[in-house]
Curated annotation (Swiss-Prot):
Ranges of the Cytoplasmic topological domain: 637-648, 699-722, 790-805, 855-1079
Region of interest (Disordered), ranges: 894-964
Binding residues for phosphate: R66, G67, F68, R69, W70, R415, I416, S417
Gene: Casr
Topology versus the membrane: Multi-pass membrane protein
Post-translational modification: Phosphorylation at Thr-888 by PKC impairs coupling with G(q)/G(11) G-proteins, while it does not affect G(i)/G(o)-coupling. Phosphorylation at Ser-899 by PKA promote plasma membrane localization. Ubiquitinated by RNF19A; which induces proteasomal degradation.
Extracellular-facing ranges: 20-610, 669-674, 746-769, 829-832
Official protein name in the record: Extracellular calcium-sensing receptor
């Protein structure tokens, strides 16, 4: 059985040796062997395997100069390690390197060789197989290049835990350690690259792109990751196509049609150079220009694509390049390559022939079967050296490698080459860790260490996973848990060299995966040259950018990147282009006209400085000065009768309340503050209640005094000055109590109202409780209504120049103002609410001030002759006569007595009319006294005295039905006209009614006189005689002051003039006694 296994292994090796001859591998012995997989050729010749004969190994074609340079980097690193005294001393590293021809099949053939040798060593069959030469196991493999190739190799090597360190396979699928257990790499995976691509598109504000990916394990995962990143950034993908170097012409044509018809100008390509080359050739043939190609690192510097004849199509490409490294001495090592000197490198012979287009085999004739290209994979490059079919000359061996420009000597940027160099050193440092391991500190069971002389592949894999060393550039090298080596990218831009017309790769930025999100990408836009040699960033959006002040609106049925620009609504703004939504302005701000920003809202209130506020302030100040002026006048003329008659103390309090009313209006002007809001309504309410309470007490007092028939002690007691102030206090205290409850439970406060108008903030007062405000105003209106009732009832009383009448007018004005205030207050808003209330307060205050005080001030200042006690008493007397006459004539049943001298016949009550007519000129210097016939009935209490004849001796005319008499009273003249119409006395007596009466009296400024007077009226008819006789005078109703104390300062004129006079009116055979109360 052992012999059988040995023979199978030998057969596998023999078959592999036939497939890979000496010229198709590089091999060198050593204590430890490293395997290598490099794409020395770009592909294999297509053959139709019809299986009619034994299948032959496929032939590799199209030489890859960069692939050979990567192989040289591995050899250089191994030789440098072998010569190092500090790294793996006393040990030699060997290598076995094979050409993968950039295909999975060739790579698996080479991998099978590594696995088979390791299997033979693990079986220890040398003694049975009788092998002539022992070949050590391959403890690690460097490679492969493409992700698709590495995926196939990793599946096979993973079965035997042989570590694989790739230098160019970046597919993120290879990070799956459950499937690829032994895979590691010195290149970042495509996850970071896909993120970087999305960041670049977002940076240039593109949102409409197309994607193309290689149909393998490199392109599909890479473009899938890009889609995820693009979706997070609202980047839309117009088309997504897969390509391959093996795609037929029809498939390529379809992809080109899609690209040509698409409106996307940016195309993201995750592919290698060989897979992309057929597509680019067709695009060049069709001359499709104006596209921006975003290249992954696999073809970002590929010479297959970066050809001068393609520049009008691919010029301006933005790509990712791996971080370039430095390998000291590597350039000289590359220049030393020679077929005769590189005995361990079977690929050197073909490299020499392809470089100098010659052949080393003497006598070789005939055309070469294939064209010779210079081409690279993933780092790329393609140059046609010779497509001629002529005979190649013999190589002399003296050719100079520096005389020919090939990608092999492109030493400017060592990216993949440096990754190869780093992969070799990673394996060497893992071996070094094994070599220097101390028992008890190892990575294996119980801290044991591996034997460096018998080291196995899985032990090397263990140490690679825990690797940590510093490279020649001073950077820390370590593999993460996924076996990846995190690195950065360079951003390159394709330019056309002005020197030789070739395409050069200019570094225009970088991508730092270690930086925090948002700061990873840096691009210098000034260095970028776009397609068509333009410096302006191309446009690749489904819709035009929405300018500031607008937002993107979704179009139904279209991708989210295809939108229409919608203007931001009022109150919202967008300060940047392509805003997905408009931002709402803060509460105190509003959008400007273009909706590009927010501006502070206009703050509006009834300000002191605005014309309306100034006008109201002036009116309020005017009211305050007028009130103060009136108060000053009253204080100065406090001892005059008209001031005394108004109850000085109560008038002072009333004027003070009016001052408060005018002043309270000022709290409604200016910016509302919490304290002004809490003060203005109570100040207004309390001031008006105080004012109305004073008026109410004055009005009610006058009414009660004039309605009283006989003054009693009740009036003197309850209408004293102290009680009047007490009533004012009680009425005002109720309002104060309402305000205290209001301020305690729900105090008003300033409020910034944003809802009334969009662009204006109205600073107003929030009243806190509408119920409390209603109670305050309601109580004020209730007192005003009561005051109006009493004032209206006493409007005809003569007290103090018809003060009750003016109070009635003032209350009427008060109600008109506040009734008008209610709809105006409800229909206004903002600052006009305060203005309406100020106007109402001022109007009501001016009405009260004018109606109650202006007439008195006018008399005091301009009519001092009327500011006398006599004037006051004369008005009282006139009122008394009118009351007496009306009371007599309206009495329904009159006691009729006839004088014995006139006979006992029953008289009838004539239809009479009494009128009074004032005549200031008709006066007599001295009244004439005549004996008149005594009245039929006299008041028994009055003193006996001779009646005063009030008219001169007149000639009687008995035939006249009407007589007129002039009655002289003091210095005034009163004319009474009494007419009688009694054609039938009996009929008139039965009618018992009066037809008409009138009385006109003129008051004079002379002394009214304080005496009893008999006022007889005699006509020609003896039966028609009417006599008015004052029968008594009673003293003041209130207080202890006597009527004679006229000059006393302490005496109230209103109280002095309050008297009760008793009159007997007789005539026509009847008499009536009437008590008249007048003031």
């Amino acid at each position: 059985m052992a012999s059988y296994s040995c023979c199978l292994a030998l057969l596998a090796l023999a078959w592999h040796s036939s497939a890979y001859g000496p010229d198709q591998r590089a091999q060198k012995k050593g204590d430890i062997i490293l395997g290598g997989l490099f794409p020395i050729h770009f592909g294999v010749a297509a053959k139709d395997q019809d299986l009619k004969s034994r299948p032959e190994s496929v032939e590799c074609i199209r030489y890859n100069f960069r692939g050979f340079r990567w192989l040289q980097a591995m050899i250089f690193a191994i030789e440098e390690i072998n010569s190092s005294p500090s790294l793996l001393p006393n040990m030699t590293l060997g290598y076995r390197i094979f050409d993968t021809c950039n295909t999975v099949s060739k790579a698996l053939e080479a991998t099978l060789s590594f696995v088979a040798q390791n299997k033979i060593d693990s079986l220890n069959l040398d003694e049975f197989c009788n092998c002539s030469e022992h070949i050590p196991s391959t403890i690690a493999v460097v490679g492969a290049t493409g992700s698709g190739v590495s995926t196939a190799v990793a599946n096979l090597l993973g079965l035997f835990y042989i570590p694989q360190v790739s230098y160019a396979s970046s597919s993120r699928l290879l990070s799956n350690k459950n499937q690829y257990k032994s895979f590691l790499r010195t290149i970042p995976n495509d996850e970071h690259q896909a993120t970087a691509m999305a960041d670049i598109i977002e940076y240039f504000r593109w949102n409409w792109v197309g994607t193309i990916a290689a149909d393998d394990d490199y392109g599909r995962p890479g473009i899938e990751k890009f889609r995820e990143e693009a979706e997070e950034r609202d980047i839309c993908i117009d088309f997504s196509e897969l390509i391959s170097q093996y795609s037929d012409e029809e498939e390529i044509q379809q992809v080109v049609e899609v690209i040509q018809n698409s409106t996307a100008k940016v195309i993201v390509v995750f592919s290698s150079g060989p897979d992309l080359e057929p597509l680019i050739k067709e695009i060049v043939r069709r001359n499709i220009t104006g596209r921006i190609w975003l290249a992954s690192e696999a073809w970002a510097s590929s010479s297959l694509i970066a050809m001068p004849e393609y520049f009008h199509v691919v010029g301006g490409t933005i790509g990712f390049g791996l971080k370039a490294g430095q390998i000291p001495g590597f350039r000289e090592f590359l220049q030393k390559v020679h077929p005769r000197k590189s005995v361990h490198n079977g690929f050197a012979k073909e490299f020499w022939e392809e470089t100098f287009n010659c052949h080393l085999q003497e006598g070789a004739k005939g055309p070469l079967p294939v064209d010779t290209f210079v081409r690279s994979h993933e780092e790329g490059g393609n140059r046609l050296l010779n497509s001629s079919t002529a005979f190649r000359p013999l190589c002399t061996g003296d050719e100079n490698i520096n005389s020919v420009e090939t990608p092999y000597m492109d030493y400017e940027h060592l990216r993949i080459s440096y990754n190869v160099y780093l992969a070799v050193y990673s394996i060497a440092h893992a071996l070094q860790d094994i070599y220097t391991c101390l028992p008890g500190r190892g990575l294996f069971t119980n801290g044991s260490c591996a034997d460096i002389k018998k080291v196995e592949a899985w032990q090397v894999l263990k140490h690679l996973r825990h690797l940590n060393f510093t490279n020649n550039m001073g950077e820390q090298v370590t593999f993460d848990e996924c076996g990846d080596l995190v690195g950065n990218y360079s951003i390159i831009n394709w330019h056309l060299s002005p020197e030789d017309g070739s395409i050069v790769f200019k570094e225009v930025g970088y991508y730092n995966v270690y930086a925090k999100k948002g700061e990873r990408l840096f691009i210098n836009e000034e260095k970028i040259l776009w397609s068509g040699f333009s410096r302006e960033v191309p446009f690749s959006n489904c819709s035009r950018d929405c300018q500031a002040g607008t937002r993107k609106g979704i179009i139904e049925g279209e991708p989210t990147c295809c939108f229409e620009c919608v203007e931001c609504p009022d109150g919202e703004y967008s300060g940047e282009t392509d805003a997905s939504a408009c931002d709402k302005c803060p509460d105190d701000f509003w959008s400007n006209e273009n909706h590009t920003s927010c501006i502070a809202k206009e703050i509006e209130f009834l300000a002191w400085t605005e014309p309306f506020g100034i006008a109201l302030t002036l009116f309020a100040v005017l009211g305050i000065f007028l009130t103060a002026f009136v108060l000053g006048v009253f204080i100065k003329f406090r001892n005059t009768p008209i001031v005394k008659a108004t109850n000085r103390e109560l008038s002072y309090l009333l004027l003070f309340s009016l001052l408060c009313c005018f002043s309270s209006s000022l709290f409604f002007i200016g910016e509302p503050q919490d304290w002004t809001c809490r003060l203005r309504q109570p100040a207004f309410g309390i001031s008006f209640v105080l004012c109305i309470s004073c008026i109410l007490v004055k009005t009610n007092r006058v009414l009660l005094v004039f309605e009283a028939k006989i003054p009693t002690s009740f009036h003197r007691k309850w209408w004293g000055l102290n009680l009047q102030f007490l009533l004012v206090f009680l009425c005002t205290f109720m309002q104060i109590l309402i305000c205290i409850i209001w301020l305690y439970t729900a105090p008003p406060s300033s409020y910034r109202n944003h809802e009334l108008e969009d662009e204006i903030i109205f600073i107003t007062c929030h009243e806190g409780s509408l119920m409390a405000l209603g109670s305050l105003i309601g109580y004020t209106c209730l007192l005003a209504a009561i005051c109006f009732f009493f004032a209206f009832k006493s409007r005809k009383l003569p007290e103090n120049f018809n003060e009750a009448k003016f109070i009635t007018f003032s209350m009427l004005i008060f109600f008109i103002v506040w009734i008008s205030f209610i709809p105006a207050y409800a229909s206004t808003y903002g600052k006009f609410v305060s203005a309406v209330e100020v106007i109402a307060i001022l109007a009501a205050s001016f009405g009260l001030l004018a109606c109650i005080f202006f007439n008195k001030v006018y008399i005091i200042l301009f009519k001092p002759s009327r500011n006398t006690i006599e004037e006051v008493r004369s008005s009282t007397a006139a009122h008394a006569f009118k009351v007496a006459a009306r009371a007599t004539l309206r009495r329904p049943n009159i006691s009729r007595k006839r004088s014995s001298s006139l006979g006992g016949s029953t008289g009838s009550i004539p239809s009479s009319s009494i009128s009074s007519k004032s005549n200031s000129e008709d006066r007599f210097p001295q009244p004439e006294r005549q004996k008149q016939q005594q009245p039929l009935s006299l008041t028994q209490q009055e003193q006996q005295q001779q009646p005063l004849t009030l008219h001169p001796q007149q000639q009687q005319q008995p035939q006249q039905p009407r007589c007129k008499q002039k009655v002289i009273f003091g210095s005034g003249t009163v004319t009474f006209s009494l007419s009688f119409d009694e054609p039938q006395k009996n009929a008139m007596a039965h009618r018992n009614s009066m037809r008409q009466n009138s009385l006109e009296a003129q008051r004079s400024n002379d002394t009214l006189g304080r005496h009893q007077a008999l006022l007889p009226l005699q006509c020609a008819d003896a039966d028609s005689e009417m006599t008015i006789q004052e029968t008594g005078l009673q003293g003041p109703m209130v207080g202890d002051h006597q009527p004679e104390m006229e000059s006393s300062d302490e005496m109230s004129p209103a109280l002095v003039m309050s008297t009760s006079r008793s009159f007997v009116i007789s005539g026509g055979g009847s008499s009536v006694t009437e008590n008249v109360l007048h003031s």
